[in-house]
Design a protein with these regions (language model features):
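Binuclear metal-dependent hydrolase catalytic cores
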Residues: 1-147, 154
């Protein structure tokens, strides 16, 4: 399983770093939608994209506006943004407001509680984290295991 770090900067990007965005290309999973989302198109492997948001602070969601370009240049069967209800409502109400970004890209929003849910072959377990305004962390169980027998012989 390959994990690609697209952004790790704090509240705003700088010349060398984008804001929070991590991708697992072979699953089409993205963790947080910071400004690193602008590099997503080159890394997409399949025809689905699932974005898991930790919270609604701008450095974690601004990249959702880049979905407009991605949906035009890539033929994706489905784009789903996952988050708790309050996070998704804040995005719909504020980020995609008429005054800020009046064109909403074509994607579904899927709200969840803290109960585990499934996307494809992966079981996702959300868990609350300590962060101003609240935040969600994720555990992904995707049936992936490494062959480690060589390590045990060392």
């Amino acid at each position: 399983m390959k994990i690609v770090v697209l952004g790790t900067a704090g509240y705003h990007p700088n010349e060398t770093r984008d804001t929070s965005c991590i991708m697992i290309p072979e699953l089409g999973f993205v963790l947080d939608a910071g400004t690193g989302m602008h590099r997503l198109g080159k890394l997409l492997v399949g025809d689905t994209l699932d974005i898991f948001l930790s919270h609604a602070h701008l450095d974690h969601v601004f990249g959702l506006t880049f979905l407009l370009g991605i949906s035009v240049t890539r033929s994706l069967r489905r784009i789903t943004v996952h988050g708790i209800g309050a996070t998704l409502q804040a995005i719909d109400r504020h980020l995609y407001s008429e005054a800020l970004f009046p064109v909403r890209p074509n994607f579904n929003m899927q709200a969840f509680s803290t109960d585990p849910f499934t996307v494809g072959d992966c079981r996702i377990t959300p868990m609350p984290l300590a962060h101003p305004g609240g935040s969600i962390g994720y555990r992904f169980d995707c049936g992936f295991i490494c062959e480690l027998s060589a390590l045990w012989k060392m």
